Amino acid sequence: SSISELQRALRLDPDMDVARLRLAQAWLKAGEAQRALGVLDTLEASPQTQMLEQLARTMLAAPRSDAGYVRHLFDQFAGDYDQRMIGQLGYTAPRILLDLASLVMPGRQDLAILDLGCGTGLAGLAFKSFAARLDGVDLSPLMVEKARARGIYDHLVVADLETALAEQGPVYDLVLAADTFVYLGDLAAVFAGVAGRLAPDGFLLFTTEAGEGEGFELGPKRRWRHSEAYLRQAAIKAGLQVAGLVAATPRHEKGQPVEGFAVALCR
């Protein structure tokens, strides 16, 4: 879509986040990094906004910004999400959740699995061999396109997590949220939604960044941190039990480990 078309769509519906995201991308492709940042500032943080923000800042710092250079930089960046997550950010959340699964549900196979905030499908890829059915949900249409291209999911939905969980649908033996809850503050509604979709012997496995004190807080990178006390309390309120809660490092930022938790909840 052209910039003018997207701006027109946003005048008609200012809450259309998909159009906002595409507008930020369009400004970047046009070499207008500052304008792209202005649009990104109006969006909730997500893996994709972080990716685009990083690209915009790279462009602003770049000595040359001719159209060909910008297009090359953008295409390279958009296509390399997985490489960036695993390489530059030391993203290990799927591996951490696999280890946790082997502890709390050893030997389980042929599972119905739901991947919350599936992104490009990195967690789905890690768990595919345990799945009889693998479904995914993500807020970003572009991420879902990449996940679909892997050919590992049975069903993919573009939706926010609470909406997807509230709908009538199958029950799951395993619900995954790898590095997803850092984009949500209060987890009460999602925990309640998951509780309603878990099979009697089902598990929710997730990673989160560690917060201080009793509750949850917004960190400097616009990523939410949750305290152990909050996670335990929110689980109980949703009618879930804590089957496991261990210290973990789901990712690195600027070479430094980000402290977090790997958590297993069950019915």
Q: Where do the protein language model's features map onto the residues?
A:
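Short alpha-helix
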Residues: R223-G239, L245
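Short, glycine-/aromatic-enriched active-site segment of Class I SAM-dependent methyltransferases
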Residues: F206-W224
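A short acidic, Gly/Pro-enriched loop at the edge of an enzyme's catalytic core
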Residues: A166-V175
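A short glycine-rich, Lys/Arg-flanked "PGG" loop and its adjoining helix->strand segment in the class I
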Residues: A188-F203
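Short coil turns that delineate tetratricopeptide repeat
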Residues: P14, E44-P47
